[in-house]
């Protein structure tokens, strides 16, 4: 019995680490929703224990990152030539990375909605320098789902994606959920004719989602 409990904790710890590596920034509420079928007290205890041992970091109460170095601006310093520094470029990398972590956390709320409704497999990160607005992907009901985020004023980023896919043959069923700031963006986004848009969604600061079919 003791061996089984240790194994369960070990497996749960591995899953927590895996999610943090994939998403980058996950709240305690999100962990509890993800592990709704497990003992939630055990999840909370393990998170506390992993922070104490330094396996994960908790920069603010109830928010977890896989590595504290992401919060250190020195981690983003670029190689200097002849001793010169580009502080602006370094700070851009720092703020850009933290913004990307927040966007992936929003995308994880969307994934959790699908996990409740269907047998959605664990998400994978879409780490694309070319298309940084593409965040997470997962498989459910025989389809690949991709979660994108296009904020107000960033709509033109879709032009490159539309142009690239126009000359590619897209195989299989790909469905895309687009996170937006407000529903008024939808009409403007439609003109890019992005393949496979299955819906639009807003995500508030508390993780509440509101969907709109295309």
Regions found by a protein language model. Give the residues of each.
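Secondary-structure transition/turn motif
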Residues: 68, 151, 213-214
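Short, flexible beta-strand-to-coil junctions
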Residues: 60, 139-142, 151-152, 180-186
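Nuclease-adjacent, charged terminal/linker segments that flank catalytic cores
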Residues: 1-86
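Generic detection of long, well-ordered alpha-helical segments
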Residues: 36-40, 100, 104, 179
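Exposed, interaction-prone assembly regions rather than primary DNA-binding/catalytic cores
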Residues: 89-172
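Assembly/interface hotspot detector across virion components, adhesins/toxins, and nucleic-acid enzymes
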Residues: 56, 123, 201-203
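C-terminal regulatory/effector modules of DNA-binding transcriptional regulators
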Residues: 157-214
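Hydrophobic residues embedded in beta-strands of well-ordered beta-sheets
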Residues: 63-64, 144, 208-209
């Amino acid at each position: 019995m003791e061996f089984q409990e240790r194994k369960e904790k070990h497996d749960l710890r591995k899953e927590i680490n895996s999610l943090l590596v994939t998403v980058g920034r996950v709240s305690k509420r999100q962990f509890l929703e993800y592990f709704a079928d497990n003992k939630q007290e055990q999840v909370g205890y393990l998170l506390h224990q992993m922070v104490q041992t330094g396996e994960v970091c908790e920069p603010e109460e109830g928010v977890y990152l896989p590595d504290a170095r992401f919060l250190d601006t020195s981690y983003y310093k670029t190689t200097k030539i002849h001793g010169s520094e580009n502080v602006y470029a370094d700070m851009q990398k720092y703020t850009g990375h933290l913004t990307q972590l927040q966007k992936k956390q929003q995308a994880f709320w969307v994934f959790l909605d699908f996990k409740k409704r269907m047998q959605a497999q664990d998400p994978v990160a879409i780490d694309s320098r070319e298309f940084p607005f593409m965040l997470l992907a997962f498989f459910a009901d025989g389809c690949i789902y991709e979660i994108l985020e296009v904020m107000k004023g960033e709509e033109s980023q879709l032009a490159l994606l539309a142009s690239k896919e126009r000359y590619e043959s897209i195989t299989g069923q790909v469905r895309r959920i687009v996170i937006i700031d407000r529903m008024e963006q939808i009409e403007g986004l439609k003109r890019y004719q992005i393949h496979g848009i299955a819906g639009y969604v807003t995500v508030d600061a508390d993780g509440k989602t509101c969907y709109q079919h295309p």
